[in-house]
Regions:
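Extracytosolic ligand-binding ectodomains
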Residues: 1-108
Length: 108
């Protein structure tokens, strides 16, 4: 977080920002894996399914229906060291959650 705050003064990191960053990293990992040849659509899809990148949110993988398996957190709104309101993660309330419809998906 320190690197982020130094690079973007006045902005606070967020889970939404982390998800957007992960999306860009996912696409980049696939483009790099196919040597920049984005016409290799099947190879890019296969690489994206591998999710071979380092997420800022920890391990990243997909369920059988291509929805991310992820943690959910309990957070409180608190004042940080600068007196600004921010989210503080209190606990992990669900670990490695897979959406409730994954078992109904034909993509096994």
């Amino acid at each position: 977080m320190e690197d982020y705050r130094k690079k973007y003064p006045g902005l606070r990191p967020s889970f939404y920002g982390a998800q957007a960053y992960d999306a860009a990293q996912l696409i980049n990992s696939a483009v790099v894996a196919v040597g920049g040849d984005t016409s290799k659509k099947d190879a890019m899809k296969a690489e994206m399914e591998k999710a071979n990148f380092k997420s800022v949110r920890g391990s990243y993988k997909y369920g059988n229906n291509h929805i991310p398996i992820q943690n959910f957190y309990l957070q409180d709104v608190v004042k940080d060291a600068d007196g600004q309101l921010s989210l503080k993660t209190v606990a992990t309330i669900v670990k490695d959650d897979q959406d409730r419809f994954h078992d109904k998906c034909p993509m096994k």
